Design a protein with these regions (language model features):
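Charged alpha-helical initiation segments
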Residues: 1-58, 78, 90
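Alpha-helix boundary/N-cap detector
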Residues: 5-17, 24, 28-31, 35, ...
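Hydrophobic alpha-helical packing segments in soluble, helical-rich domains
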Residues: 59-77, 115-129
């Protein structure tokens, strides 16, 4: 999407905004994550400043890529290694359960957990801890992986992250609404606020996830 108002100076404002928000955490993250955030800010700038550009779907698509990139770096790589080392030659029974299938795909195909899968998965693990609900094999391995890592225990199961993920999931911006013909301004603002705290609130989803890998 071309823009007459998005120039080099405006881009540097966005770059500095992102750098100031994430600080030294950016040094530990893939450059592609940074690039996705810059592109999302470019599209957000166009959406909020130019007439005739009313569709927020491109922004949500780029933020989804940023999420996938971050989750792969913070969760997928570490969990897959842990699960494969743990399983060795063992082949746990498979169940026709969406979350269990998602974890199997992570371990066997390096798939990434979507926002729609991560939220109920963490809720299931919380229910297991608080109410003794039995977990399916791969979900149990995921729960053990969290317990094995102090940073995961502290951040991935934190109440602030849980609340933000639940709100994002309930908004369906990255689910059913994403498959509509367009996303409106208010929905984009809500997604940006939850994922990035509008680059002001340190309790955003992306920031809380980034802290896991520090």
């Amino acid at each position: 999407f071309a823009s007459n108002s998005w120039d080099q100076d405006t881009q540097w404002v966005a770059v500095n905004l992102i750098r100031e928000y994430f600080g030294s955490y950016l040094d530990t993250l893939p450059h592609q994550f940074f690039a996705y955030l810059i592109e999302a800010e470019r599209l957000y700038y166009i959406l909020t400043t130019e007439r005739g550009f009313n569709d927020g779907l491109p922004i949500i698509s780029v933020l989804t890529k940023a999420y996938d990139c971050l989750i792969h770096e913070i969760i997928t790589k570490s969990f897959v290694k842990y699960a494969r080392d743990r399983l060795r030659w063992e082949v746990p029974p498979k169940f026709n359960d969406p979350l269990e299938r998602a974890l199997i795909a992570m371990v066997t195909k390096n798939y990434t957990l979507s926002i729609g899968r991560l939220t109920p998965l963490l809720s299931r693990i919380r229910d297991h801890r608080e109410n003794g609900v039995t977990l399916l094999p791969y979900t149990q391995i995921f729960a053990d992986w969290i317990e094995w890592n102090e940073s995961l225990e502290k951040n991935l199961l934190s109440e602030p992250l849980r609340k933000k993920l639940v709100r994002l999931n309930e908004s369906e911006i990255f689910g059913e609404k994403r498959h509509r013909s367009s996303i409106n301004h208010d929905e984009v603002r809500e997604a940006r606020s939850l994922l990035l705290g509008n680059y002001e609130n340190q309790q955003s989803i992306f920031m809380l996830l980034v802290k896991i890998g520090k």
